Amino acid sequence: MEDAELSESLSGTIAADAPLAKPARKYDRSIVEGPLVPAVWKIAWPAIITNLISGLQGWVDHILVGNLVGYKANAAIGVSWQIFLVVIVFISSIFIGMSVLVARYAGANEPEKVNRAVYQGFLTALFMSLGILAPIGYFCSPYLLGFLTSDPGVAAEALPYLRIMFVFSFGMLIYFMLSGALRSAGDSKTPMVLGIAMTVLNLVLNIILIRGLGPIPAFGTAGSAMGTSIASGLVGIYALWRLVRGGWVVTFPKGGYAPDWKIIKRLFKFGLPAGFQGIAMNVGGVMMLWFMGSLAQGGAAQAAYAVAYGQLFLLISWSSNALMGASAAVAGQNLGAGNPDRAKAAVNTAAMIGLSGAAFVGIFFFFFPTQLLGIFG
């Protein structure tokens, strides 16, 4: 009954829509037909490459601040990012709900409904980012940092970083939203290109803003947040322009710009369970940092945690997340196409690929820990 109501809501809104400015690309039907392993891998490998490159961006940030500012800067980024991650994971759960709808409608070959779901996800992210995350995050940052660290040097480095990330988070959220929508519709190469562009731009800006260049002063730890915000903001603006202009496999519809509460309700219904799960997992990291911050050498301990777990280990986590997104996209499209057995097999296939990759990286970490940690200063 609820699915029928949502379909009626989508169809009613779409009926008044004008044609898109530019024809959208067709969905890749090999995801719901043909061999399964190539279908999963086709979506997974660009996402893995994107996440690995994004992970290297974090490496560069920590290497620069660790060598130019000191270990307290590593701790500051680690503490700030853990706080930011708890909030961003919860908001990003909306995109999981959006991706579920996109995959189902793409599998059923209903592009108008896909585009409506994407647009409502954008509206929800816009409100939560600018209306909730930015103001509350800015004013609560000192209290959150005071809870996690007793080292005044770490807190002083972390406060401007965290405030910048909260206030200018919208570009990053737009990228996360678009990546999830495109992958769920079967296109993971476009997010890869955007992710590489954002990472390269971020690296250049961070190197300049952290250490300074010519008339540009060295901003230290805050420069890392500034570079991330500028790079993600520029990519977010470009993505919005393309969504309005058309030509991607997902676009914004013409007309029907008001919030559709039936769709938004479904976004939360599908996404909130994953959001609460993500919060529970990341709160564990927050409590670990709180305990470390209470120690006599809390700053050094938090710096070690930020590098070892927050950067090195997350290479495995980000790759796993990419495979999770790929399996969700393939499974969702096959459910939409009426292939439940193939959907279940897609999840198992992605799990086996992820297990093999994690084992390989884990062996590398086991034999070369000193060399890997040494590059962070």
PLM features per residue range, with description:
Residues 44, 78-81, 125-126, 162-165, ...:
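Residue-level recognition of transmembrane alpha-helices
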Residues 75-134, 172-191, 304-369:
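Small-residue-rich hydrophobic transmembrane alpha-helices
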Residues 131-163, 360-377:
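Short membrane-interface helical motifs at transmembrane helix boundaries
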Residues 152-178, 311-312:
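Alpha-helical transmembrane segments of multi-pass membrane proteins
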